Amino acid sequence: MDIAHDLQSIAAQEHALVFPHFDADTAWQLGAYLHEIAKARGLALAIDIRSFGQPLFFSLLEGATPDNVDWARRKGNTVAHFRRSSYAVGLKLQQSNATLADKHGLPVSDYAAHGGAFPLIAKGTGVIGSVTVSGLPQRADHELVVEALCAHLGHDYSKLALAKA
């Protein structure tokens, strides 16, 4: 895995995956789609979609644990703080051999710089919330969210997917 290349790819994902508008119905549609593909693939996940300060969708699939719920909360907090994908934040920290606590004074009890939370970006508004999954390795969590966003927004996932690790 090339961190610099992944960071460029994530920046392209964040630039492309913009909603023309986003509301509670959009959150429900996106969350239901994530739930269905996770269920079809037999994935044990927590799925959390929220605007900042307000939950919009939550689902816990068979086999997911309270730890997955807490990881989702912490990854979502990271997006809220940095307005970037939690995976991008983690990769940037990895590049500088730092942690959220070292570099930003953020407690690990409330923030996680691991893949799986992606900013919800509305055209003309900017980052309005996050969509998060937790239950897979962090790169796979990130990619599942990107795959679902591509499907919802009509983008070709193969053009936005991270390079194979």
Curated annotation (Swiss-Prot):
It comes from Paraburkholderia phymatum (strain DSM 17167 / CIP 108236 / LMG 21445 / STM815) (Burkholderia phymatum). NCBIfam families: PRK02487.1-4 (NF002695), PRK02487.1-5 (NF002696). Transmembrane segments: none annotated. This is UPF0303 protein Bphy_1660. Coiled coil: none annotated. It holds the Pfam family HbpS-like. It comes from the Bacteria. Belongs to the UPF0303 family.
